[in-house]
Structures are given as structure tokens and as C-alpha cells.
């Protein structure tokens, strides 16, 4: 696979988010435990039997196994600390009817739920409830069937499947089909799709949410709906309105997109000294959203070197839908400052490019996509996001570099927009960050277990976020919903959602689409059955 090497950093914090919460009332009084009542109720409301030893996990029965299941897909390790709230038990359904039954029974018994597919959400809302306790966890990891139909250029995908599994199953059937989804192959489809979902094909084909054809979803009454049954308003809301507000999607029908047999990837790293006048990073800001849509170039900025000799590296990771000869000609004309050469480029298939961007070692077999784990491991981290509308001037860049050097184990990921992202109206789906957006920033800081610098790293995120205010979007200052940040604000306890408070953080994620989301929520879930710390609120009665 040539000289291009994946950057061993951030692929798996380009994440997905699946958090669903369930209505909570005063628990039913009974001699039997809530756990027993729940299981008995589910059995009465499903036609598919299930072995308890494979579907029910409790700390009382087997704390080791319970912890193993709880931790299995949790990606942000700070939320597995002993001080964090834990579910009373975990139920892992093996059939969609058991998800329907879980909703029906939660209403009857007054149990508060969180639902998880891949566990990559930044604030752990899919497996931690700060606002309502006790709660239980519905784990969808066993609902992972994928049916690819090349003749119709489509596929049905269940929420527990990962992006890597989806990519593998597509490539298994065709070398010239793909799907515009994310870099991190261990992300679960379930939540990823609900936030819109972006990746290296976004400039050519838009978001994952832009390429959804149909769904199967369970609503607040436990009813199974498809696109025709739910209507276009609800279908619109669930393709980018964030998980946990409208229902549980049990399967997505997605549109496959054409990809060439040959894809070219490249990696070019420049230090601050090599780009002392900042011409390369400045030119990237100008052209990355305007270059032909077959090219996607993201940049990772981070500190490097020893304490006495620190610098900043800017790593340009690119993908071109075509052969390297064509790429080099385009880059020489549009972005000569990068100095891209033939030896920087590697030709490969689309599925091999997925391995490259996922951070897998060069030469890894594509079957590694079925292992479900990220090659980069898990992390203790804090992250947030911004959207940039105008190029950041040199003085602003210098302030960023200064803070990166001070932050140590921190980095920024800049993802270019433009292309198809500028052509799709911001009201097409709830994800509104379209025409006029140059690039998105991910701010990221990580630390080790029991690291005394954790509070400093969290403060670093807050400080650089404040510093960047003059250089990013405003009124509202926008953010990506799949990069949830509770520092923007959150709903309060129980079902008492303050619409005024939600108006503070809601437009950050959705801009003007937030009001439409609230209207749809009020219509389909007026009792606020599905909720979490940043779920869409219904209008007050």
C-alpha cells in the first residue's frame, strides 16, 4: 500500500452518537423486583423467546459479566468511573419485537432507559443517565444484520452493525459501490445516522443522512413504523435531528453510491518551522472547500517534540476518487504549497482506503473490519466542535499553535466542506451546516487514568474554545450534534423540559431547523417519552 501511512490519532473520535431515553413515572409497587417485572412483561409482549443468560446482565447475579458488557463498547473511559451512575441492569435484545416490548413495558413499569448501539457518544448519554436514576440500559449490539442489494444500489442495516461491518459487506458484493460514512470503523450505525454522519465522501455525495431511503422505527407507543407509515416530517427529523428524541430506529435503508476501482490516498506532514509563514495552512483554508469534490483533504494539528523543543505538526490526510496521476495534476494547479509528490500517494481500492482512514496498519486484511474494535483503543477525553465561515488569519493561527504547544496531548481536526455539502439546502435534513461553511473543527484533549492533569485538559478545551470565538460561526455559534457537549446546556430532571433552556443549545446544533424539530416532537411524543440531557423538547402544554 505504498508510503502513505494512516495517522495514529483521531479516526475513532469521529464518532457516532446513539442515546435514547424512556418515560419515567412512579414505579409500580410489587413484591417482584423491577427487573423481574420487566422481563416478564417483555416475554408477554414478544413472540420470540430469548435466553436470559445471553440477554439479561445484572450486577447482583454476575458483576464481572455485567461490567464486561457495560464496558464493551463504551469509548470515553472517564464515564466508566465508579462515581458515574450505572444502569440497574442491561437488556440486550436479539429481535426487534423485544425492542418494541421494552418500550411498552417501560411505560407500564416506569423504568427510565438509555439505549446504546456503538457507545461512541462524547458525553456517554447512551449508557449514563445524570438526570434520572435508577435507569437501565438497552444494548442493541446484537441487532446487526446487513443486507446489501447491488441491483437496487441499496442496503438495509440494523443499528448494532458498525461502519466497518457495513463497508466490508458492501465491498464483499461490489468493488465499485460505497457509502458516504465515517472514518472510525467501530462506530455503531444506530446513533451515527441520527446525527447526519460525515466522512471522506461527503464533498461528493453529502452526509450519510442525505442518503437514507427508508427506515424501520419503533415509536413512543411501541409501534413499528416505516417511512410511509410515519410520514415525511418524522422521516425528516430522524435523519440528523440527533438520537433519543423520536424513537428507536431498528434498521436504515441506505443508498449506495458509485466509487471508482482506484482511489488515491496521501499523507503530508509539515512542522511549524517548515510552514513558518503559514502559507500552506492558509492556502488549505482557501481551497479545501472549493477544490473538485472528488478530493477530500482534512488536517490534524497537534504539538510534537520534547518539552525544550516543541513545535506543531500539520498533517494533511487526503483522498481522491481516481488515480494518482490525475490527482497530482489537480493539486499542482490548485494547491502547490502542499508540495504533494508521487511518493506521498498510494493507489488502492475504496475498502482499503477505509482501512487507511480508520488507522489500521498498512497491509491489514479487510477482514479486520469485522473485529469491531478500533486499532487506536479507548480514551479518557473531552471534545467539542466549531464551524468556520471565513479563513482564520495568521494572527489567529499563531494563537492556536501557542495553545496546542501548551496543551500537550491535545489536537484539532479540521474537516473541509464545500462540494455537495454546499449544494444541499440546510433544511433538507435537520443537519444545517451547509453552504458557506469552509470547515469544521474538532477540539480534542485526552489523558491517562488517574492523571492529575485531567482537569487541566478539560480547562484547555474551554480556553481554546473561548479563544476561537472571533474566528468561527456566530449567532448562533454552531456545533455538530454527534459531538455532543453538555457545557452548552442540558435538560433538567425527569420529563420537565424547559423549552427556553433548550433554545440555548438547540440552535447550535440545528440552527433554524430546531423549531421544526420541536413541532415534530410535540406531535409524535408530547409526553416526552424519549429524552436525555440534550433531547429535543416538546412544546409546553
From Swiss-Prot:
EC number(s) reported in the record: 1.1.1.-
Disulfide bonds: 41-105
Entry keywords, A to Z: Cell wall, Disulfide bond, FAD, Flavoprotein, Glycoprotein, Nucleotide-binding, Oxidoreductase, Secreted, Signal
Family: Belongs to the oxygen-dependent FAD-linked oxidoreductase family.
Sequence position, cross-link 6-(S-cysteinyl)-8alpha-(pros-histidyl)-FAD (His-Cys): 120-184
One GO term (biological process): response to oxidative stress
Keyword Ribosomal protein attached: no
Protein name as annotated: Berberine bridge enzyme-like 24
Domain FAD-binding PCMH-type: 83-259
Chief location of this protein within or outside the cell: secreted
Parts forming coiled coils: none
Presence of the UniProt keyword Disulfide bond in the record: yes
Cofactor(s) the protein needs: FAD
Intracellular or extracellular location(s): Secreted, Cell wall
Organism: Arabidopsis thaliana (Mouse-ear cress)
Amino acid at each position: 500500500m505504498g508510503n502513505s501511512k494512516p495517522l495514529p490519532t483521531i479516526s475513532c473520535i469521529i464518532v457516532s452518537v446513539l442515546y435514547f431515553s424512556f418515560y419515567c413515572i412512579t414505579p409500580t409497587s410489587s413484591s417482584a423486583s423491577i427487573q423481574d417485572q420487566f422481563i416478564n412483561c417483555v416475554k408477554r409482549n414478544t413472540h420470540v423467546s430469548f435466553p436470559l443468560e445471553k440477554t439479561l446482565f445484572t450486577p447482583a447475579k454476575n458483576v464481572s459479566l455485567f461490567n464486561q458488557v457495560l464496558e464493551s463498547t463504551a469509548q470515553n473511559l472517564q464515564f466508566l468511573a465508579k462515581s458515574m451512575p450505572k444502569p440497574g441492569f442491561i437488556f440486550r435484545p436479539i429481535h426487534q419485537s423485544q425492542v418494541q416490548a421494552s418500550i411498552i413495558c417501560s411505560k407500564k413499569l416506569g423504568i427510565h432507559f438509555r439505549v446504546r448501539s456503538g457507545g461512541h457518544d462524547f458525553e456517554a448519554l447512551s449508557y449514563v443517565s445524570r438526570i434520572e436514576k435508577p435507569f437501565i440500559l438497552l444494548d442493541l449490539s446484537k441487532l446487526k444484520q446487513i443486507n446489501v442489494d447491488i441491483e437496487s444500489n441499496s442496503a438495509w442495516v440494523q443499528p448494532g452493525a458498525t461502519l466497518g461491518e457495513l463497508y466490508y459487506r458492501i465491498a464483499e458484493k461490489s468493488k465499485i459501490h460505497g457509502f458516504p460514512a465515517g472514518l472510525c470503523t467501530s462506530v455503531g450505525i444506530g446513533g451515527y445516522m441520527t446525527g447526519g454522519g460525515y466522512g471522506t465522501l461527503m464533498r461528493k455525495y453529502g452526509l450519510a443522512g442525505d442518503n437514507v431511503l427508508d427506515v424501520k422505527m419503533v415509536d413512543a407507543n411501541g409501534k413499528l413504523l416505516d417511512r410511509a407509515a410515519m410520514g415525511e416530517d418524522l422521516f425528516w427529523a430522524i435523519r440528523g435531528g440527533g438520537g433519543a428524541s423520536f424513537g428507536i430506529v431498528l434498521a436504515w435503508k441506505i443508498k449506495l453510491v458509485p466509487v471508482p476501482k482506484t482511489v488515491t490516498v496521501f499523507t503530508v506532514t509539515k512542522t511549524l518551522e517548515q510552514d513558518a509563514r503559514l502559507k500552506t495552512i492558509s492556502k488549505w483554508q482557501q481551497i479545501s472547500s472549493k477544490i473538485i469534490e472528488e478530493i477530500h483533504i482534512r488536517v490534524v494539528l497537534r504539538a510534537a517534540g520534547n518539552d525544550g523543543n516543541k513545535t506543531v505538526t500539520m498533517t494533511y490526510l487526503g483522498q481522491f476518487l481516481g488515480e494518482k496521476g490525475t490527482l497530482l495534476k489537480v493539486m499542482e494547479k490548485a494547491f502547490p504549497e502542499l508540495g504533494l509528490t508521487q511518493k506521498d500517494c498510494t493507489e488502492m481500492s475504496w475498502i482499503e482506503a477505509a482501512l487507511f482512514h480508520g488507522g489500521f496498519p498498512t497491509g491489514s486484511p479487510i477482514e479486520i473490519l469485522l473485529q469491531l474494535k478500533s486499532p487506536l483503543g479507548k480514551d479518557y477525553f473531552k471534545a467539542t466542535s466549531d464551524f468556520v465561515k471565513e479563513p482564520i488569519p495568521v494572527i489567529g493561527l499563531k494563537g492556536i499553535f501557542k495553545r496546542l504547544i501548551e496543551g500537550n496531548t491535545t489536537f484539532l481536526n479540521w474537516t473541509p466542506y464545500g462540494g455537495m455539502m454546499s449544494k444541499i439546502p440546510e433544511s433538507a435534513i435537520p443537519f444545517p451546516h451547509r453552504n458557506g461553511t469552509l470547515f469544521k473543527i474538532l477540539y480534542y484533549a485526552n489523558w491517562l487514568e488517574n492523571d492529575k492533569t485531567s482537569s487541566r485538559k478539560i480547562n484547555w478545551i474551554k480556553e481554546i474554545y473561548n479563544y476561537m470565538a472571533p474566528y468561527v460561526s456566530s449567532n448562533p455559534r454552531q456545533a455538530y450534534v454527534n459531538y455532543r457537549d453538555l457545557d452548552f446546556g442540558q435538560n433538567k430532571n425527569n420529563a420537565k423540559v424547559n423549552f427556553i433552556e433548550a433554545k440555548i443549545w438547540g440552535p447550535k446544533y440545528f440552527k433554524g431547523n430546531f423549531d421544526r424539530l420541536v413541532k415534530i416532537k410535540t406531535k409524535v411524543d408530547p409526553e416526552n417519552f424519549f429524552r436525555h440531557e440534550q433531547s429535543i423538547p416538546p412544546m409546553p402544554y
